[in-house]
Amino acid sequence: MKNKNSKQNTHSTIGEQDIHYFHEGKHIYAYEFMGAHKACEGGIEGIRFTTWAPNAKSICVIGDFNYWQVEDKNYMEPITDAGLWSVFIPNAKNGDKYKFVVTNKDTNHYVYKSDPYAFFSELRPNTASIITTETQYTWSDDKWLEKRAKTNYYDNPMNVYELHLASWKTKDGKFMTYDELSETLPQYIKEMGYTHVEFMPLHEHPLDASWGYQPTGFYSVNSRHGDIIGLKRLVDKLHNNDIGVILDWVPGHFCKDQHGLIYFDGTPCYEYQEHTKAINKGWGTHNFDLGRNEVKCFLISNAMYWINEFHIDGLRVDAVSNILYLNYDREDGQWIPNIYGGHENLEGIAFLKELNGVLKHTCKGVVTIAEESSSWPDISTPVEKGGLGFDFKWNMGWMNDTLRYISLDPVYRKYHHNLITFSMVYHYSEKFILSISHDEVVHGKKSLINKMWGDLWNKYAGLRLYMSYMIGHPGKKLIFMGSEFGQFVEWREYEQLQWQVVDQYESHKQTLHFFKKLNDFYHNETALWQCDYDHHGFRWIDADNSQQSILSFIRSSKDNKQKLIFICNFTPVTYYDYHLGVPDAGSYKEVFNSDNLEFGGSGQVMATEIFSSPQSSHGFEQRITIKIPPMATLVLKLIK
């Protein structure tokens, strides 16, 4: 590869302040000048290319505009001593494909690299970046954004539908475009009663089976479904249907395909310098060097890019444990302690605090959610109070315990009663989201309905029981696509969900109907979401009835005027004349019953009011006597 003796670039349109803040790690809009941008210099229109490669000897831009030839005029020039390179190419234009040819200064070895800041890329297996300057879109979601800025999600409903775009639905066996999805997805989510959709990663990734969690193009919209404008149109349509959009975001590690970020200038650049810290053996990826200023700029600017350019309402941050712990998924001897001898990743902790601090300061109403499975404290505590600053944390403990419980034969559930009650011991330590995500319905774990115990009737009943219990449990909610109609096969990323079963089988149609009614019930009852993180909002009636495997508890609204009594029967036994303590004297009415005939249940519902009597029970001065249907959740409400 030819070496070019570079000279200081005097024609760069990049401001000195931008350069300063970029190298200081404080620039949060680096995408505005890094990568490929339309420019007019000396009266000539073209594209200015800028990248960061501190150990490069030379960088040449090749592409459609120069027939992919290395030419002297297309070599970048260094604009700082810290590795910022730039060049203006007059005849480059929107839609041209390009790559960087990066030569290392010590070895003279060169590699062909995609642009880390490219806004669009070729569909796999091709790997070139694509100049994308026509990204303007006229949004129509002003009312949504105004509402978002004023919303406190802690005391509002939040019921999330997690979605993998490529396999939700296909068209003639092919990926649906963002525009095609705009015609069906918003309406479906609205009709089903979900408040938010959570997209699994939408940035470019080479391997379909990675589901987007091993990205190469952090700024590149997933080209499988169309272009930038198409995605903006989809988000706009969702917002106009009062549906929030959360994006899975992967700031901890990246794909090690050679065209990507790995050894970008021939040396560790975006990854840690220490090989042991850089290598992520578990996932076959490289870990970001979260202590390096330019890497922090790359990532925090990326978060800002998705939020500002695509009006994303929240980021679910993937694999937070991998960011927090130096010894995450590593044996002794495979990790390097921090300067104090501990296993905490000090750079990762600082990065997460800075990320959340920036977003809180600049993006009103945008939420961040931690996918984190350890007992690290104060994840959802504000940064100024010593926490990491996330708004929410997935409750992985609740998920693991309750899925284990619901898979047990009811005969043995009484010996494992703590699995279904333990979550309330620690619930108020974080702002939890109860999540049944994609990770729980793949790799031999079975689909959600297939995790349920028993024959077909009991599986459907168990699913209704479990989901009703989940709706009653404090915390926001998340469910993965396909669970809402009881798909029996595990999720497969290479094919669409089995929607045909809804038309073919009454049981699946009834299950879909159940989820819609349950979601509507959740949304309409303030007691179910107004005090999720306030002790006032939840009270046990009886948490200790392990012998009958029955749970009972109260959910209350802020003003205490709305109270719901949940009774969950985790056995296939009908209980007659069951005495239950209640907080208030008066008349109680059934407002939800998962055993309803319209859901596919046995139809053991209470059509008449139930009057309390002045008899002590479960620590209350009043009690009611009820019939509890089998494998069902019963919800009562005081009406007078």
Swiss-Prot record:
Matches recorded under Gene3D superfamilies: Glycosidases (3.20.20.80), Golgi alpha-mannosidase II (2.60.40.1180), Immunoglobulins (2.60.40.10)
GO CC annotations, alphabetized: cytosol
Reactions catalysed: Transfers a segment of a (1->4)-alpha-D-glucan chain to a primary hydroxy group in a similar glucan chain
Alphabetical list of InterPro entries matching this protein: A-amylase/branching_C, Branching_enzy, GlgB, GlgB_N_E_set_prok, Glyco_hydro_13_cat_dom, Glyco_hydro_13_N, Glyco_hydro_b, Glycoside_hydrolase_SF
Record GO biological process: glycogen biosynthetic process
One Pfam entry name: CBM_48
Protein's pathway: Glycan biosynthesis; glycogen biosynthesis
Source organism, top-level taxon: Bacteria
Keyword annotations: Carbohydrate metabolism, Glycogen biosynthesis, Glycogen metabolism, Glycosyltransferase, Transferase
This protein's record includes keyword Transmembrane helix: no
EC number: 2.4.1.18
Active site: D318, E371
GO molecular function terms noted in the UniProt entry: 1,4-alpha-glucan branching enzyme activity; cation binding; hydrolase activity, hydrolyzing O-glycosyl compounds
Subunit note: Monomer.
Family note: Belongs to the glycosyl hydrolase 13 family. GlgB subfamily.
Function statement: Catalyzes the formation of the alpha-1,6-glucosidic linkages in glycogen by scission of a 1,4-alpha-linked oligosaccharide from growing alpha-1,4-glucan chains and the subsequent attachment of the oligosaccharide to the alpha-1,6 position.
Protein name: 1,4-alpha-glucan branching enzyme GlgB
Native source species: Francisella tularensis subsp. novicida (strain U112)
